[in-house]
C-alpha cells in the first residue's frame, strides 16, 4: 500500500510518500510559510532536492503543490493520483473521542473541530489538511492518527486533576498527553530490539525535542505521561515553561498587568530553556554558550536534565520497575551530554551507564548505551512518526 503521510502545521505542511510493504519513504518534503510572504516547497527524492518558490495562500494550494511534485516528470514518484492508496494525517488532539486511529468521515471531522479549543494552533491546520485532500484527491480514504490516542489507556487516577469534579464534567479538563505516535513507535522498536514481547515490558520513553515529554509504558499501554491538558505541562522545553506552580501565573498577571494572551505568550514562547538562558531554545547553542562560561546557559541545560531524571524516577515507581529507558527525537537521539545527565547516578535502579558507548553512539539505528551487566537497558531509538502513521493507516484499511 502506498500512503501519503501529512503533518499540517499552521504555516507548514510536511509530507512523506511511504510504501508500507518496504516501509521506505519514496520521497518527502515540506511546504513552508503557507499564507506568508516567501513561501516555498522543498521536495526530496533519492538524495536529490528541488526547491520551488511561489505564493501559497492556503493549505489547498499547498496540497496541490505536493501532488504536482509527486507527479513531477523528473522528481515525481507516481504517474497519477490513482497510485495513492490512502492519506494518513497527523492530528494533534483527539480529546476523549479517539483512543485509536480512525477513517475520516463527517462525524470524525466534527469531533476534530470540537477539539480545536484544546489545540488552537494545531487542530485547525490538521483539519485544513484533511479537507484539502478530500477536495484535491477525491475518493481516497483519509485516516486521522491522533497524538493523544495512545495515552487514552491512562487510568483515571493518573489523568484527572484535583480540581472540583464538575470542572472535568463541564469542560473535559484532564491530562491528555501528546507525542503518542512517537512514544508508541519507539516502544515497539525497543521490544523488537530486545527480542521480547511488548506486552511483557515496562518502558520509560523520553521524547526530547523542541517539545519534550516522558511516558510510562506498561505492557504496551501508556499509563502516565508528562504533558497534560495541553503540551505546556511537564518538562522544561525549548520555549515552554513546563509545569509550574499555578499561583505564579495569577501573581504575575496581577503584578505585571498581563492579560491571558500575554501570559499564554510568556508560558509558550518565552519560557523554557530560552527563558532561563536568554540565549536560545537550541541545545547546540546552549552547549556552546555554556562551554564559553555562560552560567545561565549551563543552568538551563541542568534544569532540563534534572526534570527528565525526576520523571524517570517517578515513572519507575509508577511501573514498579523498568526494563528499558529510551531516548528519542532531536535532542534524545543526538545529544550525548543531555543523555548522560539524565541517566547518571541511577545505579540504585539497576542502570549502569556506559560513557564510551553514549559518546560514540551510531546514528540512525537502535543503540544501547548501558554496560553489559546493567539490569536496565538504556537505548537510543530513532523515532519515525510518519512511518507509524503509514502503518496505522494500513492497519485500519486492511481491517
From Swiss-Prot:
Q: Which cofactors, by name?
A: Mg(2+); Mn(2+)
PROSITE patterns in UniProt: ACETATE_KINASE_1, ACETATE_KINASE_2
For this chain's record, the cofactor binding note is:
Mg(2+). Can also accept Mn(2+).
UniProt cross-references to InterPro entries, sorted A to Z: Ac/propionate_kinase, Aliphatic_acid_kin_short-chain, Aliphatic_acid_kinase_CS, ATPase_NBD
Chief location bin: cytoplasm
Q: Where is this protein found?
A: Cytoplasm
Query: What molecular function terms (GO) are annotated for this protein?
Result: acetate kinase activity; ATP binding; magnesium ion binding
The record's keywords, sorted A to Z, are: ATP-binding, Cytoplasm, Kinase, Magnesium, Metal-binding, Nucleotide-binding, Transferase
What is annotated as the active site?
Answer: 147 (proton donor/acceptor)
Q: Where is this site: Transition state stabilizer?
A: 179, 240
Catalysed reaction per UniProt? acetate + ATP = acetyl phosphate + ADP
One GO cellular component assignment for this chain's record is: cytoplasm
Would you kindly state one Gene Ontology biological process term found in this protein's UniProt entry? acetyl-CoA biosynthetic process
Which sites bind substrate? 90
Q: Which residues bind ATP?
A: 14, 207-211, 282-284, 330-334
Which pathway does this chain act in? Answer: Metabolic intermediate biosynthesis; acetyl-CoA biosynthesis; acetyl-CoA from acetate: step 1/2
Q: What is its EC number?
A: 2.7.2.1
Q: Which of this chain's residues are annotated to bind Mg(2+)?
A: 7, 385
- Name the HAMAP family on file: Acetate_kinase
Q: Which family does it belong to?
A: Belongs to the acetokinase family.
Record's subunit section: Homodimer.
Its annotated function is as follows:
Catalyzes the formation of acetyl phosphate from acetate and ATP. Can also catalyze the reverse reaction.
Q: What is this protein called?
A: Acetate kinase
Q: What is the lineage of its organism?
A: Bacteria, Bacillati, Bacillota, Bacillota incertae sedis, Caldicellulosiruptorales
Q: Which gene encodes it?
A: ackA
Amino acid at each position: 500500500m502506498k500512503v501519503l503521510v501529512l503533518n499540517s502545521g499552521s504555516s507548514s505542511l510536511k509530507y512523506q510518500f511511504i510504501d508500507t510493504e518496504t516501509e521506505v519513504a519514496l520521497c518527502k518534503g515540506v511546504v513552508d510559510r503557507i499564507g506568508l510572504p516567501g513561501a516555498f516547497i522543498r521536495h526530496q527524492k533519492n538524495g536529490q532536492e528541488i526547491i520551488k518558490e511561489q505564493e501559497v495562500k492556503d493549505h489547498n494550494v499547498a496540497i496541490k503543490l505536493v501532488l504536482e511534485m509527486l507527479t513531477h516528470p523528473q522528481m515525481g514518484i507516481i504517474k497519477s493520483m490513482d497510485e495513492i492508496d490512502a492519506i494518513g494525517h497527523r492530528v494533534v488532539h483527539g480529546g476523549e473521542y479517539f483512543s485509536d486511529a480512525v477513517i475520516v468521515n463527517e462525524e470524525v471531522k466534527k469531533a476534530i473541530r470540537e477539539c480545536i479549543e484544546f489545540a488552537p494552533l494545531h487542530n485547525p491546520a490538521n483539519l485544513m489538511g484533511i479537507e484539502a485532500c478530500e477536495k484535491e484527491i477525491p475518493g481516497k480514504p483519509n485516516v486521522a492518527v491522533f497524538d493523544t490516542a495512545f495515552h487514552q489507556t491512562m487510568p483515571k487516577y493518573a489523568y484527572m486533576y484535583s480540581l472540583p469534579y464538575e470542572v472535568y464534567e463541564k469542560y473535559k479538563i484532564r491530562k491528555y498527553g501528546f507525542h503518542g505516535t512517537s512514544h508508541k513507535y519507539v516502544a515497539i522498536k525497543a521490544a523488537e530490539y530486545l527480542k521480547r514481547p511488548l506486552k511483557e515490558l515496562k518502558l520509560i520513553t523520553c521524547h526530547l525535542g523542541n517539545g519534550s515529554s516522558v511516558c510510562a509504558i506498561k505492557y504496551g499501554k501508556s499509563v502516565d505521561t508528562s504533558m497534560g491538558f495541553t503540551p505546556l505541562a511537564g518538562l522544561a522545553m525549548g520555549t515552554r515553561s513546563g509545569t509550574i506552580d499555578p499561583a505564579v501565573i495569577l501573581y504575575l498577571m496581577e503584578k505585571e498587568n498581563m492579560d491571558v494572551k500575554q501570559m499564554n505568550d510568556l508560558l509558550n514562547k518565552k519560557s523554557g530553556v530560552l527563558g532561563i538562558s536568554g540565549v536560545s531554545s537550541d541545545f547546540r547553542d546552549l552547549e556552546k554558550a555554556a562551554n564559553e562560561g555562560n552560567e545561565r546557559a549551563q543552568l538551563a541545560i541542568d534544569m532540563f536534565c534534572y526534570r527528565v531524571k525526576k520523571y524517570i524516577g517517578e515513572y519507575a515507581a509508577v511501573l514498579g520497575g523498568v526494563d528499558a529507558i529510551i531516548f528519542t527525537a532531536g535532542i534524545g537521539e543526538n545529544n550525548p551530554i543531555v543523555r548522560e545527565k539524565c541517566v547518571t547516578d541511577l545505579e540504585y535502579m539497576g542502570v549502569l551507564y556506559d560513557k564510551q558507548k553514549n559518546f560514540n553512539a551510531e546514528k540512525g539505528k537502535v543503540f544501547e548505551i548501558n554496560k553489559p551487566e546493567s539490569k536496565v537497558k538504556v537505548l537510543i531509538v530513532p523515532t519515525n512518526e510518519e512511518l507509524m502513521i503509514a502503518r496505522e493507516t494500513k492497519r485500519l484499511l486492511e481491517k
